[in-house]
């Protein structure tokens, strides 16, 4: 690692610790030439993911865009910001584990809905109404039907 003060490439690591909730390593270093101390961060390089939109246009996956959509859907529900962050983290992990370079916006939306379904019906409906472009009350009713318990199961119990 090159020293920012003298550009010497010899340094020693004084301290290493996990940073950014385990997604990076923070290292405190000291230059062996001028004794200047500096901090470096080491992260796993991830493959950028491209989102293919309905219009067939492509854009780079934006964590903040997904996070903002979830925050809007979860407003005034019992879902806190930490849980919303963990949903976005989980979706990013799934995309990386699948080694996907491209994902359709519809697949991404279904991943979000899958995470929301067990958490909050209100947040699910809000997100679905934007993502699925609801045009009227029938779209809401149709989606709400998925939350009704199975009638066969209800009669058995």
UniProtKB/Swiss-Prot annotation:
Family: Belongs to the NrdR family.
InterPro entries: ATP-cone_dom, NrdR-like_N, RNR_NrdR-like
Keywords assigned: ATP-binding, DNA-binding, Metal-binding, Nucleotide-binding, Repressor, Transcription, Transcription regulation, Zinc, Zinc-finger
Function description: Negatively regulates transcription of bacterial ribonucleotide reductase nrd genes and operons by binding to NrdR-boxes.
Domain of life: Bacteria
Name of the gene encoding the protein in the UniProt record: nrdR
GO biological process, one term: negative regulation of DNA-templated transcription
Polar residues biased stretches: 1-11
Ranges where the ATP-cone domain occurs: 49-139
Organism of origin: Prochlorococcus marinus (strain MIT 9211)
Protein name as annotated: Transcriptional repressor NrdR
Needed cofactors: Zn(2+)
Note describing how the cofactor binds: Binds 1 zinc ion.
Residue numbers spanned by region Disordered: 1-21
ZnF (unnamed) ranges: 3-34
Single Gene Ontology MF annotation: zinc ion binding
